[in-house]
A protein has these predicted regions:
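Short secondary-structure boundary motifs at beta->alpha junctions and helix caps
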Residues: 77-86, 154-195
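Structured, soluble extracytoplasmic/luminal domains of envelope-associated proteins
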Residues: 85-107
Length: 202
């Protein structure tokens, strides 16, 4: 092969590589998107005189959801997640933080801590069984399965406990809508939880 032929061959290979890169999106990559949960406007119980110190313990989560990727399912047998659509932080941390914000706004307790700092009067525990997008044919839903427990630190018997598991319809497969729907579900759960806690007299 002559020198001119070698140069031409290298040029053709380079152009082919550039064309393949453009075809497969190598030159322009989609950005990673991050989503979070927000506090909704809910009906708060009549707090009365705030008393006692509550610690919101670190929430736990089912092992399959221990990731920042937003999970979606198309059947009971599927378990998939988005590569570029992520929760801004671990879902159990987000849910615990938002739950703490609801409790602070309720005024039921004199103080609410999310970090251990001495022995509290009460503890709120949470476990997430599922936080996901559910796709069923042409319908989409957001699902949040969450167990909440209020107890005293020295007691194994809960003062109040309930497992919530509901879905809310969303209009499309858009993670932002899923985050909004899960926020609304969490708000609904916390409204019931705060009412029950207030009624139980803590």
């Amino acid at each position: 092969m002559t020198r001119a032929a070698k140069v031409l061959f290298v040029a053709i290979v380079a152009l082919a590589a550039m064309a393949l890169t453009a075809c497969f999106g190598g030159s322009t990559s989609e950005p990673t998107r991050y989503f979070t949960l927000a506090v909704e406007n809910i009906n708060m119980p009549n707090a009365g005189d705030a008393s006692g110190r509550l610690q919101v313990r670190k929430f736990t989560i089912d092992q399959a959801y221990q990731r920042n990727n937003i999970v979606y399912r198309e059947s009971a047998y599927d378990f998939m997640f988005y590569d570029l659509d992520l929760w801004a932080s671990r879902p159990e941390q987000m849910v615990a933080q938002v739950a703490a914000e609801y409790i602070v706004k309720s005024g039921l307790f004199a103080s609410v801590d999310t970090r251990a700092s001495g022995k509290p009067d009460f503890e709120l525990l949470g476990h997430i069984d599922a936080i996901e997008e559910v796709d069923e044919g042409s319908s989409q839903y957001a699902r949040l399965s969450l167990k909440l427990t209020l107890q005293k630190p020295d007691s194994d018997a809960p003062l109040w406990e309930k497992r919530f598991d509901e879905r809310q319809s969303v209009s499309s497969r858009e993670p932002r809508l899923v985050a909004e729907a899960i926020s609304k579900l969490l708000g609904k759960y916390m409204e019931e939880a705060l009412g029950a806690i207030a009624g139980a007299g803590k």
